[in-house]
Amino acid sequence: MRHRTALMGAVAAAALIPGMALAQERERGSSGHLNMIYWQAISTMNVFLSGGTKEMNAASIVLEPLARFDNMGELTPWLVDEVPTLDNGGVSEDLKSITWVLSEGLLWSDGTEVTADDVVFTWEYCTHPEGGCAYRDRFAGVESVEAVDDRTIVVSFEDATPNPYLPFVGAGSPIIQRAQFQDCTGTRAPECTDANFAPIGTGPYVVTDFRPNDVVQFEANPNYRVPTQPYFQTITWAGGGDAAGAARAVFQTGEMDYAWNLQLAPEVIEQMEAGGRGELLVDFGPLMERIEINFTDPSPSLPEGERATRQHPHPILSDIRVREALSLAIDRELLTEIGFGPMGQPTCNFIVAPPAMASPNNDACLVQDIDRANELLDEAGWEMGSDGIRTRDGERLELLFQTSTNAVRQDFQALIQQWWREIGIDTRLRNIDAGVFFGSDPGSPDTYLKFYADVQMYASLFEGTDPTPHLEQRRCGREPQPDTQWQGQNINRYCNEEYDALWSELNREPDPDRRVELVIALNDMFVQDFAHLPLVARGRVSAASTTVGGIVMNVWDSEHWNQAEWYRIEE
Amino acid sequence: MTDASMQPSGTPPPPAEDVHDLRPPRNQWWDVWDQFKTHKGALAGMIVFISILLFVTAGPWIWAVDPGLIDIRSRNQGSSWAHPMGTDQLGRDILARMMYGGRVSVAVGLVAMLLGLLLGTLIGVLAGYFKPMDGPLMRLTDLFLALPLLPLLLILVTLFRDTLEGMFGQATGVFLLIVFAIAITSWMQTARIVRGDVLALKEREFVLAARSIGTPSRRINTRHILPNVMSPIMVSATLGIATAIITESALSFLGLGFPPDFPTWGRILYDGRDWIEQYPARVVWPGVFISLTVLSVNYIGDGLRDALDPRIRGR
Amino acid sequence: MLNYTLRRLAFAVPTVLVISLIVFLMLDMAPGDPTASLPLTIPPEVREQMRLALGLGDPVLVRYVKWLHMMVVVEPSHMIANATGWNIGVEGPRILSWQTRSPVGDIIVQRMPQTLWVVGLGYLFGILIAVPIGVISAYRQYSWFDQAGTFVSMVGFSVPTFFTGVVFILIFSVWLGWFPSMYDTTHQVRDWDSFVFQVRQIAMPVAVLALFNASQISRFMRASMLDNLNQDYVRTARAKGLREKTVVLVHVLRNSMIPVVTVIAIGIPTVFTGAIITEQIFRVNGLGDALIRAIYVSDWPMVQTITFIFAILIVLFNLIADVLYGILDPRIRYD
């Protein structure tokens, strides 16, 4: 699996080189028309109002941030000439402010000039208390955003911030035009349909026709800053159908040039790929499928308000030996092979990417060890009963295992149920509609936040390349609880003073190398406590026609981050 | 009106050849059966349907393989002696899953149809015969016709799932929920058609005659009206059972029916859809079973329709 | 008759209102969270704010009255304004979809053409096929044509559309490459070539739907014809010396159409909500697709509005069916 990813990188690099060499011959619009399909269609072009990955991808070819991450996860200047750092003086010594300077001569697609004022407006727009901006947490801790002159922006933070690259960085934090959106702040945001569907941007394309949840048409931006780009004159960005239909359209019928998010059974994808018209693009980011272990007692006999809170530790799973046994009984290689094939990698880490931050210390869990698991349970005092289920003090070893309704997850549930049965655990399975499970309605008993089950499975990730906020989620007190309306991201109610102390150190540490060490230490502490069971690192999976060149898969930003450089390979 | 149609169909005139026979008059259901037998399609449908019923009820005793047993080494296999219909992506035996899935699908079809039919006929007759009830009942029908099945199902799931699961366990809970949801959203066609026929029937001479000799309403309905709307009800019933089975699989297709770990024919078909190129059998088997069941039921309905109609019978 | 129609129309208004209130309350009770489909990178606090921005703070009845005002006053005015170019759009907020944050009315107008093309034609062809098959099957009961017709219609009815659809795509689109596997909503018919393209892209879904609809309707047609062929008036007509063609095509057909017309009229509203599954398989972004996707992401204003339009159409077509009933069958007296 690993060599496959490396190979992908090589292909990407190779694709870049002819792209560069031929850049002189190619001109804006010379590649004609591009067809793309997202089987989950685009619902709006205003990322701030949606928050969905698909909307972010579509908007990324129109709206751009000041800097974004390239395919290696490196910060790359986009609307600026250089990324501000401590070394070049762009970031202040006390880590409390960052100064961005826009490139000269930047134009919006309507021909007007991009100014620092637009950047300030973007901040005002997204932080408006009634606007419901989906990327508001990008501006968490930001005290002010000021325009020093037409091209210079100073972002000031309330506290020392070792990672100041959240506001205006990456596809989730692009710049919008004040002139277009100034009457659309707060509660009026959704009323500006025309602006939300066809925002004026600095990117390589402009929207010519937008049909929500159906199709978007783009045309090359006449004022794009690179005069020879973009190579495709027009783009049709279709939506609808299902993943199999989208894959078929690229691989077999050739109706489409690019298809997004092809979560299909591995054998199915391989068969379609044999059609030869397209190739699969896979790269691995921080997305990881895991089993969360509940440290609190979800028993329905507890009163509402105390159920699944830290007042009642879990009677079975508080014992680390049981948690380790659960982990040892799972064959992660097999799960990956069945559920994701080349689109997944078995893992034992909480932080699976960027590669430098993935801990090398936990690979032991990749090997299934039923015997050891049985030993551990024996040690913990659970004795095998005559029906093959363990008991302790008359209590049966029973677990409730919940997840969202999804074919791959139900296959995983069935497999894991069988493995856990081999070590004497009776697992009851339950699946909940994704719209309810991932909802955050405090009134619903079935959300993943309430966690009224013993273990649950889902996938999660973090944005950008900095896992600090992701690691913060597991701090004591961050768990969903009645006092916080069940909001909070410490899903398994993990609580460890050592962990909290180490995280505080990470949050203050500016030195990159030391930060990596700390991230690995935190990761190891968390997973060696078997606080949750990582299963599979999942890749981003898209497919591209063999006739389109210049595509560089990117898991750290929008997949379309270099859309301007895509071109048609002439036969 | 001829004598034949003046007679309530419960007591058809004895066939001519029986006139001189001294045996007691035959039960009318024998006549129905005689007529039914002459319909080759219906007879074939009956045989197929009984075979399917045997397959799903007695099958698991003969083919005693656990449909949930995962055998990962033999996954994605074609048909063999060990697995006559092959195995799925987890190595589960598809034949065993078809048997268990069929139980659910057939049961959903039958129960939902009966429930829907009962409700539809009752409301149709009441609305058609009793004028004061016509308006309110038909508005109720309109109302139900306008309710979309899918959101209704979602709501029913949240409101009643915990209670039903607590009372009957997860499997039975979901089953009851889906049967109820299908029935509650499928009785309206029957009601409207029955009402339409009743409206026409009650203006007919034999009903007027019955009423003029003082027959009470209930009796007119059970003896004169109901037997005469039997044929549309039968057509509705066969359509209903088919619709129920197809609705169940359609719900699974949309991810709103039975959960993926609960095999039903619709669910197996849906799960096999992505694999149609590699293993067409995985779509074809459940597809064929659904189709055969519906087909046989339709033929049975067709035969019954002819057999139950005294005007056709004995022609 | 006119009196009856007017009375029914007067009844229709409260009916529709009650339906809309029930649907509104049901959706309000429904589980599902419009922010559930967002990536988990968006923290719960931000989700809470997004939900507040959707207007979920108000009590349910306030939201219902607001919605009703927008539905019956604001949206129609904008629809008329868009269709005619008159500047009569009523000021004020419109019904906004939670997912796209844009007026629901505009999306419905956008989705209408493809639904009418595909599902409408599927229905029309279905009727056109069904009526003659039903008539001939009944007239020549138990003939080889009847047996074959019955068998084909039974098969068409028995095989689920998502099975036929997937098989059709595999054969005609993947293996043979005759038809595109997805529907291009931006395509406009301008000349012969673009018309041919339109025919190609609707061919498969229309075929699947027509087969399915024809099977259903021909069953009713045949049953109804059989009922009538044995009636006394047919014997009388024949005894009178009328030509067989006149007897069957004028007398019997007219009477047999009564229940069939009911079935056809009741089915018409489904044309508008679209055959959800067929639209999904053939990637036609019609109204049915809009409805099911709105359900997936808990976009209740969208579901509510489409449902409401559906309700109006059903009430309307039921009324039409009843009026037709009276016209076709003079024995039925409504007054």
Give residue spans per PLM region.
Chain A
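Surface-exposed binding/hinge segments that line
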Residues: 29, 135-185, 209
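A structural "hinge/loop" feature
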Residues: 39-60, 79-80, 164-174, 202, ...
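N-terminal lobe/hinge region of extracytoplasmic solute-binding protein
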Residues: 34-91, 124, 200-204
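Bacterial N-terminal signal peptides that target proteins for export
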Residues: 1-9
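Active-site-proximal polar cores
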Residues: 535
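Bacterial N-terminal signal peptides
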Residues: 9-19
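Acidic glycine-/aspartate-rich tracts in secreted/extracellular proteins
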Residues: 41-42, 105-106, 160-161, 242
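Extracytoplasmic/periplasmic ligand-capture domains
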Residues: 22-27, 68-71, 83, 88-89, ...
